[in-house]
Amino acid sequence: PPPPPPQQFPQFHVRSGLQIKKNAIIDDYKVTSQVLGLGINGKVLQIFSKKTQEKFALKMLQDCPKARREVELHWRASQCPHIVRIVDVYENLYAGRKCLLIVMECLDGGELFSRIQDRGDQAFTEREASEIMKSIGEAIQYLHSINIAHRDVKPENLLYTSKRPKAILKLTDFGFAKETTSHNSLTTPCYTPYYVAPEVLGPEKYDKSCDMWSLGVIMYILLCGYPPFYSNHGLAISPGMKTRIRMGQYEFPNPEWSEVSEEVKMLIRNLLKTEPTQRMTITEFMNHPWIMQSTKVPQTPLHTSRVLKEDKERWEDVKEEMTSALATMRVDYEQIKIKKIEDASNPLLLKRRKKARALEAAALAH
């Protein structure tokens, strides 16, 4: 029999509908004032299940359509082993305001790069970098396969489940997540447009490509300890740095990169492409030998842990720069999408395109 066709994505089953509980959260959990972290939209507190005494994390959001969307998308993604799991969601009144209370598994292992920085003498290797990128890639692959772009993949949103060596790395904070299927797509049951500009059907590419850029930056830092784009003046994000990001100006300086193969540098180049539509997709990334066959990746010792230790006081700036770069990118891509859709529905442009295609077809016919 012929081999089965290759599947683009493993078939994931999406979690069944989210049931929001209306009873008071304090019926079921003991809420403490211990702050675990600050999410994009609010603090995260430590809480304990009254039934099992197990520890969980609680995120509080003021109820509004944006908060509902965050909860809904995070809930759908919550099946993935590399995404922080939502356990319960409550709608309660708090200080007279309607709030959504999200109970999540507690990730006690700290941030990705703190863990690498705190290593003793054993070197961090290229193979470990590949394994880490694979687990982050699995989270993104899951999201993209169910048409969600996270749009805020950055170091502080990557946390370990525990301090143990075998801990699992998970992606958190869905405050900027976005559904990428265009519901108002141009194809209706009785009308399939004969020709549609690819930019009208492909705006979701932009949102997803934001995640791919993040993968490139994180992979770069994993391999050397510093980011590809940084501001020279110690400002959070300088005009010069914005230009470098836009122009894709970065290097692979020695000694940190001298032992890293050309193939790996090429993978980073394909993730950091300045034109979002040319960036590698998550499927291509997951199929790359460096990711797919991480057991074959050489155990080259890297400079990462030493550089992170030496630049410890710069790390807050690095995080701020990435936060800022992602914010700029989200705004830019929204504007590009709007402009492309306007261009695509501009009758004069459409006429010119039609003419050009007719000429092209005629030329091919000869």
UniProtKB/Swiss-Prot annotation:
Modified residues (Phosphoserine): 238, 294
Residues the entry annotates as binding staurosporine: 105-107
InterPro entries in the record: Kinase-like_dom_sf, MAPKAPK_C, Prot_kinase_dom, Protein_kinase_ATP_BS, Ser/Thr_kinase_AS
Top-level division of the source organism's lineage: Eukaryota
Location of the Protein kinase domain: 30-291
Keyword field contains Repeat: no
Region (Autoinhibitory helix): 294-330
Motif interval(s): Bipartite nuclear localization signal 1: 337-340
Alphabetical list of CDD domains matching this protein: STKc_MAPKAPK2
Cross-link Glycyl lysine isopeptide (Lys-Gly) (interchain with G-Cter in SUMO): where in chain: 319
UniProt record similarity statement: Belongs to the protein kinase superfamily. CAMK Ser/Thr protein kinase family.
The protein, known as: MAP kinase-activated protein kinase 2
Gene for this chain: MAPKAPK2
